[in-house]
């Protein structure tokens, strides 16, 4: 039986298997199968039809010799019968079945409203289709858009992907669950701003936190957990293309009209007073605008109220809340460059960067294999890995991908924010902080030696508390012959007594090494060609790029019995000033001048010349608990201290090798020094030798202010700092809203429970 050309209608090819496009065959596949719209290998109807027309002539001759009747019986006689089974093969189960379902689908689906989390491996496929090349070397290839956040994220954005937010969309909720149960369940991870339960009968609720770290912690801990015999399905919820006023990203502030001389560290000093800063970001080609992102929305609100319309470096700044949507903005600009003329649209639609959701440390040590592991073994791309050449697996550096339209390529800006001191209003009246104009943009690198791919780094805790490694300090401290500019922000922002610093020991942050002053290194292949760190890392091969101290200045008294000591600052010798003059250095200083800053001088203490009371106890065995440390201290120093904090590595469930203690008076420092410094520890047969140094944050009040809004207050109370009320009794006095304050009672707070320790 001959089959004439054209008998195979184009519509009938919907029933052909998609595998037909993968294998050559003399006969088409006629077997009926369901349509798979997600099959990435299916061909268009026109392509398949043209191919079948090409083979139709030969098919007739081949069928003459064989059994043609079964095939003839399968063909329909008329056109209606040909289309009759088409709809039967379509899977309509995903469409809403009721009016209520239709409303939910409209609110949370792809048509608008809130964007739900997508599968990370789904996003991986999309990301690879947008692969870009940073330079001509294949080894240096990095995807521009890789993964979504919330599941082992890395730097990079997907235009329509999900980013961590402070609001969680919780599905599969049992309608019998009480609101109080939900409140108690989610409140253990942080203060809840709003709990929306009006749609609980439909199976979902919305939980909004003030702190983005709380929402991420809740998602990690509760994802898939059973609640009333139902597994929770949790997603981040963020506004889509046209956010309303209530969807404004309250945690990120846009700073307009900045002077070019104001660096990220300057902004950190100014804005960090109001809360912990997650990130400070720059905008390509517009250095007079920057984004300051806080972990907590309340901190951003406080900074907005206090600093809006104030002057920094002689220019009046303007602050506004940022809006999500910057990733979509970049794509729209490529299609319509005229949008670039609208500055307000550009900066009010800046998306939250997914950088902070990147896991701390190296992916190779992660319990979850990252999806690029298999991709990096490709024979085409070679050894591709985002953690390639990272030699310090416990320290993760923030990197942000910034699209430079003029140069047509993507640069990696290393913008890790490190801790710096903050000052209150009273201190500025007596001594205003001076910052040389030549500092430019500051980063948290240590000494960059002559090797082009080697960068030494200080861990965040060392920046926070001081006591750096000697290898991080230069031969000569920094000084400048230029006129220094001042930042007159203290006159407008009222009382700035709360001292906040970046970082509060997230999981896996602290190194496993018992020696906390050890230095790690991060290497970048071809770094000099495709890496910028603010303005200072243009040439990483320069041997003159050093970690330098700020200009010599005495300790600053904050007005509340606390002292602040100057922090280290990194500048580039090779980076000229804007007017062409170069930086100069004082040759009279040496490395010892910097290190002595945090060393204890018993003679000065005995003469009353050193008022500092907060100490860092280093080289503590990692198995020591807080109670063990308290017992060791109380053997000879009971009642001489009023604050103790033993940082915990939550990943490894042990301490990180050091602790911080505040003595009631400087005179008690000598006894503690004699009891511990240079001595071995009694327990666990440890060979570690204890050593003492001064901490950077000084004074009980400053320590309490630092931890007031820290996410550490959401952790187990055994991991939190404790404040004592003198020699009579000792209690942890952490209260609601994650605040510390000294206890003046011999009864423990009801939120804490029984006494932790008594003398």
Curated annotation (Swiss-Prot):
Which residue ranges does the record assign to the RRM domain? 166-239, 251-324
Q: Does the keyword RNA-binding apply?
A: yes
GO MF annotations in UniProt: RNA binding
Gene inactivation effect: Early flowering.
Any one GO cellular component localisation term in the record: nucleus
Q: Which UniProt keywords apply?
A: Meiosis, Repeat, RNA-binding
One GO biological process term: positive regulation of meiotic nuclear division
Q: Which InterPro entries match?
A: MEI2-like_RRM1, MEI2-like_RRM3, Mei2-like_Rrm_C, Nucleotide-bd_a/b_plait_sf, RBD_domain_sf, RRM_dom
Say what the protein does: Probable RNA-binding protein that plays a role in meiosis and vegetative growth.
- Which PANTHER family does this entry report, sorted A to Z? RNA RECOGNITION MOTIF-CONTAINING
Official protein name in the record: Protein MEI2-like 3
């Amino acid at each position: 039986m001959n089959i004439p050309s054209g008998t195979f209608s184009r519509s009938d090819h919907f029933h052909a298997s998609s595998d037909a496009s993968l294998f050559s065959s003399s006969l088409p596949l006629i077997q009926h199968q369901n349509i798979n719209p997600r099959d990435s290998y299916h061909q268009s109807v026109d392509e398949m039809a043209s191919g079948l027309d090409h083979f139709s002539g030969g098919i007739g001759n081949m069928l003459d010799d064989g059994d043609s009747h079964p095939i003839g019986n399968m063909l329909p006689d008329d056109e209606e019968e040909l289309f009759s089974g088409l709809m039967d093969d379509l899977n309509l189960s995903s469409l809403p079945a009721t009016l209520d379902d239709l409303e939910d689908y409209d609110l949370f689906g792809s048509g608008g409203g809130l964007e739900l989390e997508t599968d990370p491996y789904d996003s991986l496929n999309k990301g690879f289709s947008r692969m870009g090349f940073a330079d001509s070397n294949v080894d240096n290839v990095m995807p521009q858009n890789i993964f979504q956040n919330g599941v082992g994220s890395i730097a990079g954005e997907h235009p329509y992907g999900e980013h961590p937010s402070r609001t969680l969309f919780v599905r599969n909720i049992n309608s019998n669950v009480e609101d109080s149960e939900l409140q108690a369940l989610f409140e253990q991870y942080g203060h809840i701003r709003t709990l929306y339960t009006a749609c609980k009968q439909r199976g979902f609720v919305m939980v909004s936190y003030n702190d983005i770290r709380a929402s991420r912690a809740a998602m990690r801990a509760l994802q898939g957990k059973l609640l009333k015999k139902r597994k929770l399905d949790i997603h981040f919820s963020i506004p889509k293309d046209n956010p309303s006023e209530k969807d404004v990203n309250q945690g990120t502030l846009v700073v307009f009209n900045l002077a070019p001389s104001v660096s990220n560290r300057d902004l950190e000093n100014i804005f960090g007073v109001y809360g912990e800063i997650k990130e400070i970001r720059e905008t390509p080609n517009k250095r007079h605008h920057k984004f300051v992102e806080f972990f907590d929305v309340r901190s951003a609100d406080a900074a907005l109220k206090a600093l809006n319309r104030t002057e920094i470096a002689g220019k009046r700044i303007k602050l506004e809340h940022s809006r999500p949507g910057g990733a979509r903005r970049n794509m729209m600009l490529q299609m319509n460059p005229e949008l670039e003329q609208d500055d307000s649209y550009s900066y009010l639609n800046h998306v939250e960067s997914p950088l902070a959701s990147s896991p701390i440390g190296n992916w190779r040590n992660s319990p979850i294999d990252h999806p690029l592991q298999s991709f990096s073994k490709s024979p085409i791309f070679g050894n591709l890995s985002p953690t390639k050449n990272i030699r310090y697996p416990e320290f993760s550096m923030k990197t942000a991908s910034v699209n430079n339209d003029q140069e047509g390529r993507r640069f990696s800006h290393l913008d890790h924010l490190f801790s710096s001191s903050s000052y209150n209003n009273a201190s500025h009246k007596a001594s205003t902080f001076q910052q040389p104009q030549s500092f430019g943009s500051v980063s948290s690198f240590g000494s960059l030696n002559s090797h082009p791919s080697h960068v030494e780094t200080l861990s965040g805790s060392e920046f926070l508390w001081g006591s750096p490694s000697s290898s991080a300090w230069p031969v000569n401290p920094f000084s400048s012959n230029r006129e220094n500019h001042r930042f007159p922000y203290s006159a407008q922002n009222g009382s700035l007594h709360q001292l906040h610093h970046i970082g509060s020991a997230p999981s896996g942050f602290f190194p496993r090494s018992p020696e906390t002053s050890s230095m790690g290194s991060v290497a970048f292949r071809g770094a000099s060609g495709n890496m910028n760190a603010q303005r200072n890392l243009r040439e990483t091969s320069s041997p003159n790029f050093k970690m330098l101290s700020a200009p010599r200045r005495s300790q600053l008294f904050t007005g509340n019995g606390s002292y602040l000591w100057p922090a280290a600052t990194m500048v580039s010798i090779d980076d000229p000033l804007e007017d062409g003059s170069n930086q100069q250095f004082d040759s009279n200083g040496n490395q010892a001048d910097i290190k002595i800053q945090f060393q204890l001088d018993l003679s000065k203490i005995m003469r009353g010349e050193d008022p500092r009371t907060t100490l860092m106890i280093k080289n503590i065995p990692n198995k020591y608990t807080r109670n063990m440390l308290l017992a060791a201290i109380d053997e000879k120093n009971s009642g001489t201290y009023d604050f103790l904090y033993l940082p915990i590595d939550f990943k490894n469930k042990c301490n990180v090798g050091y602790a911080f203690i505040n003595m009631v008076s400087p005179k008690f420092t000598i006894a503690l020094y004699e009891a511990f410094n240079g001595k071995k520890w009694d327990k666990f047969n440890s060979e570690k030798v204890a050593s003492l140094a001064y901490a950077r944050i000084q004074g009980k009040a400053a320590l309490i202010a630092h931890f007031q809004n820290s996410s550490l207050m959401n952790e187990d109370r055994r991991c939190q700092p404790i404040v004592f009320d003198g020699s009579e009794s000792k209690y942890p006095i952490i209260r609601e809203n994650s605040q510390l304050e000294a206890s003046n009672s011999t009864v423990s707070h009801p939120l804490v429970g029984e006494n932790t320790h008594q003398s």
